[in-house]
C-alpha cells in the first residue's frame, strides 16, 4: 500500500462525536476523512441542549456550523456526506480499510467509530411519530420547555422495572406538578411502583393497556388512548427506547461489546479491544447525549492521534494504549 493513499484517521460518523474527533486530528495537523451517512439519532427533535453557547440550537445548525468551521480552517480534513460504510477490516500493514456501498475503498492508520445508535420504536401506533417531540428519551435534553403541568413515564421496555421507572419519574417531579407512571397492562409492576413511592405525593400509576398515542391539540402534548376507550393527555411522556448499533462494523472488526451492545472501550482512552480502533459517542457509552458525544469524540481523537504519533516515531505512548 502506498503511503500517499493513506490518511492518518478514518472517522465513521458525522455527528457530534465524529466531528469532535476530526477537530482533534485537525489541531495536530494530521489528516482524516469523516464519513457522514446523514442519519442522526436526534433528527426528529427541533432543538438540542446542554452545550454552553449552543443551547436551544437546531441539531442541523450545530452540525453545519461544525462542518464549515472544520473544513474552512483545516485543509487536511475531508468530510464526505451521504456515504455509507458497509465493510471494515484491519490490514496486514496494521492499518484499516473501509468500503462503501459503491465499492470504493479508503485506508487509514487509525479508525474511529462514531456511528451512533438507532432507537428501536415500540410497536404501539403513534409512538414513532411522536418520538423526539412529545415522547422524549432524555429529560436533560427535553422537558424543560413543557414544565409546569403533568407528565408521564412509559414504564415498559428499558423502563419496565421499579428502579429505572422511578429514576425517570424523580426527574419529572422537578419539571411537572403531577407524574403518572404508565405500565401498559402490567398490574404487578404498578403495584411494585406504588409500594416504592415512599413519601412522594406527586407520583401515581396507571396500569391500563395502551391502544395508541396521538398528538395533543395544536400538536402540543401527547394524548394516550387506552383499549377501554378512555383517554388522558400529558404535556410530555418520557421513555427510553431500546437501541441497536447502526452498522455491524464492530462485529466485522471483532470488537468486544458491553452488556447493552455498546462497543467496549478502555476508560478514559476510548480505545476498543482491537488496537488502533477507538469508539466515541452513543455507540460506546452508557450516557447517550450530545455533551458526552462531544467529549468522548475529542478523547477518542486525541488518543488516536497520540497513539499514531508514538507509532510513527517508534516509541511508546505515555498512555497505556
UniProtKB/Swiss-Prot annotation:
One GO term of the biological process aspect: cellular response to toxic substance
Protein name (record): Thioredoxin reductase tcpT
Organism: Claviceps purpurea (strain 20.1) (Ergot fungus)
GO molecular-function term, one example from the UniProt record: oxidoreductase activity
Cofactor note: Binds 1 FAD per subunit.
InterPro entries: FAD/NAD-bd_sf (IPR036188), FAD/NAD-binding_dom (IPR023753), Ferredoxin-NADP_redctase_2 (IPR050097)
Cofactor dependency: FAD
Intrachain disulfide bonds: 138-141
Pathway stated in the Swiss-Prot or TrEMBL entry: Secondary metabolite biosynthesis
Domain of life: Eukaryota
SUPFAM superfamilies in UniProt: FAD/NAD(P)-binding domain
EC number(s) recorded for this UniProt protein: 1.8.1.-
Keywords: Disulfide bond, FAD, Flavoprotein, NADP, Oxidoreductase, Redox-active center
Family to which the UniProt record says this protein belongs: Belongs to the class-II pyridine nucleotide-disulfide oxidoreductase family.
Binding residues for FAD: 14-17, 36-41, 49, 114, 282, 289-290
Signals that turn on the gene: Expression is positively regulated by the thioclapurine cluster-specific transcription factor tcpZ.
Function according to Swiss-Prot or TrEMBL: Thioredoxin reductase; part of the gene cluster that mediates the biosynthesis of an unusual class of epipolythiodioxopiperazines (ETPs) lacking the reactive thiol group important for toxicity. Firstly, L-tyrosine is prenylated by tcpD, before undergoing condensation with L-glycine in a reaction catalyzed by the NRPS tcpP leading to the diketopiperazine (DKP) backbone. Afterwards the alpha-carbon of tyrosine is oxidized by the cytochrome P450 tcpC to form a hydroxyl group.
Amino acid at each position: 500500500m502506498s503511503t500517499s493513499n493513506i490518511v492518518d484517521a478514518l472517522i465513521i460518523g458525522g455527528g457530534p462525536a465524529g466531528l469532535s474527533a476530526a477537530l482533534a486530528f485537525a489541531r495536530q495537523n494530521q489528516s482524516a476523512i469523516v464519513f457522514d451517512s446523514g442519519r442522526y439519532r436526534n433528527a426528529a427533535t427541533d432543538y438540542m441542549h446542554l452545550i454552553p453557547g449552543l443551547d436551544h440550537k437546531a441539531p442541523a445548525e450545530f452540525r453545519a456550523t461544525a462542518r464549515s468551521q472544520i473544513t474552512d480552517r483545516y485543509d487536511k480534513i475531508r468530510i464526505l456526506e451521504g456515504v455509507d460504510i458497509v465493510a471494515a477490516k484491519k490490514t496486514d500493514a496494521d492499518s484499516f480499510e473501509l468500503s462503501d456501498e459503491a465499492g470504493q475503498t479508503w485506508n487509514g492508520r487509525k479508525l474511529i467509530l462514531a456511528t451512533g445508535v438507532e432507537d428501536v420504536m415500540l410497536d404501539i401506533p403513534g409512538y414513532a411519530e411522536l418520538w423526539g417531540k412529545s415522547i422524549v428519551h432524555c429529560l436533560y435534553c427535553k422537558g424543560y420547555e413543557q414544565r409546569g403541568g403533568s407528565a408521564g413515564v412509559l414504564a415498559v421496555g428499558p423502563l419496565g422495572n421499579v428502579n429505572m421507572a422511578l429514576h425517570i419519574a424523580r426527574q419529572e417531579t422537578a419539571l411537572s406538578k403531577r407524574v403518572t407512571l404508565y405500565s401498559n397492562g402490567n398490574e404487578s409492576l404498578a403495584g411494585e411502583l406504588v409500594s416504592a413511592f415512599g413519601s412522594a405525593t406527586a407520583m401515581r400509576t396507571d396500569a391500563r393497556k395502551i391502544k395508541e398515542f396521538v398528538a395533543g391539540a395544536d400538536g402540543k402534548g401527547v394524548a394516550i388512548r387506552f383499549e377501554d376507550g378512555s383517554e388522558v393527555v400529558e404535556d410530555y411522556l418520557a421513555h427510553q427506547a431500546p437501541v441497536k448499533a447502526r452498522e455491524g462494523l464492530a462485529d466485522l472488526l471483532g470488537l468486544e461489546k458491553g452488556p447493552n451492545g455498546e462497543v467496549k472501550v478502555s476508560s478514559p482512552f476510548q480505545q476498543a479491544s482491537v488496537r488502533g480502533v477507538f469508539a466515541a459517542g452513543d455507540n460506546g457509552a452508557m450516557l447517550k447525549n450530545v455533551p458526552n458525544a462531544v467529549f468522548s469524540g475529542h478523547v477518542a481523537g486525541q488518543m488516536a492521534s497520540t497513539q499514531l504519533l508514538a507509532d510513527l516515531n517508534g516509541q511508546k505512548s505515555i498512555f497505556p494504549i
